Amino acid sequence: MPSGDASADPIEARFDPAAMPARMAAALDAMRLGIPVVVLDDADRENEADLIIAADRLTHAGMAMLIRECSGIVCLCLTAEKAAVLGLRPMVEHNRSQYGTAFTVSIEARVGVSTGVSAADRITTIRAAVAPDADAQSVVSPGHVFPLVAQAGGVLARRGHTEGSVDLARLAGLSPAGVLCELMLPDGTMARRDDAVRFADQHGLPVLTIEDIARYREQMARAVSFA
């Protein structure tokens, strides 16, 4: 077999475009069950893997995994409409970050938390923020959860984990809000593709790419247009 053949790389084979529907089905099932999904962005972008959990289905075990295995910067991905209802303003007036990541001010639940740092407290904060009746009185700033605002077009507008999180939650039939944290290695470096696949296999988690989500949405749009 030629050494340049993608099939010679078992990890590359995991991302066969023909298997995208199966990867998406596994990821959406996991979102509905509150199981983390390992999502990779493009190799020429951040080239990082995030663990993503539907905000509606967040559990103590899921949050503990985010804190233990990831960077510790737990982010809540929201639509612009939800962020506005919560009264969340941008973290800075002029966003100069490399990828335009739309951080708002950090938040804490107004009631029900102590220091806000524990897994239980961060879950309380996220539940307060995504509750159907949540408003600007539900949370305070600063805090230990970092909201991110997704662009309206999702991954078709911006190929970021923020948009991927909201798209996955919406595609799973849940509220359009996701919780994410960047996967890290024990030595403090960021997990890349092969590291992320090994982690997913060790923990029995589905793995997919932002490209998978974009292709899935494009296929859905074509199916609707031809219906």
Swiss-Prot record:
Q: Where is this site: Essential for catalytic activity?
A: 144, 182
Q: Where is the signal peptide?
A: none
| Cofactor dependence | Mg(2+); Mn(2+)
Q: What Enzyme Commission number does this protein have?
A: 4.1.99.12
Broad class of enzyme this protein falls into? lyase
Q: Which GO cellular component terms are attached?
A: cytosol
Detail which positions bind Mg(2+) 2: 46, 161
Any GO MF annotation of the entry: manganese ion binding
Q: Does the keyword Methyltransferase apply?
A: no
User: Which BP terms in the Gene Ontology apply to this protein?
Assistant: riboflavin biosynthetic process
Residues that coordinate or bind D-ribulose 5-phosphate:
45-46, 50, 158-162, 182
Instruction: Report if keyword Metal-binding is assigned.
Output: yes
**Record pathway:** Cofactor biosynthesis; riboflavin biosynthesis; 2-hydroxy-3-oxobutyl phosphate from D-ribulose 5-phosphate: step 1/1
Q: How is the cofactor bound?
A: Binds 2 divalent metal cations per subunit. Magnesium or manganese.
Kindly state which reaction or reactions the protein catalyses.
D-ribulose 5-phosphate = (2S)-2-hydroxy-3-oxobutyl phosphate + formate + H(+)
Binding, Mg(2+) 1:
46
Question: What UniProt keywords are attached to this protein's entry?
Answer: Lyase, Magnesium, Manganese, Metal-binding, Plasmid, Riboflavin biosynthesis
Family statement:
Belongs to the DHBP synthase family.
User: What interactions and quaternary structure are annotated?
Assistant: Homodimer.
Please describe what this protein does.
Answer: Catalyzes the conversion of D-ribulose 5-phosphate to formate and 3,4-dihydroxy-2-butanone 4-phosphate.
- List the PANTHER family hit by this protein, alphabetically: 3,4-DIHYDROXY-2-BUTANONE 4-PHOSPHATE SYNTHASE, GTP CYCLOHYDROLASE II-RELATED
Could you identify this protein by its name?
3,4-dihydroxy-2-butanone 4-phosphate synthase
Naturally occurring in which organism (per UniProt): Ralstonia nicotianae (strain ATCC BAA-1114 / GMI1000) (Ralstonia solanacearum)
User: Top-down, what is the taxonomic lineage of the species of origin?
Assistant: Bacteria, Pseudomonadati, Pseudomonadota, Betaproteobacteria, Burkholderiales
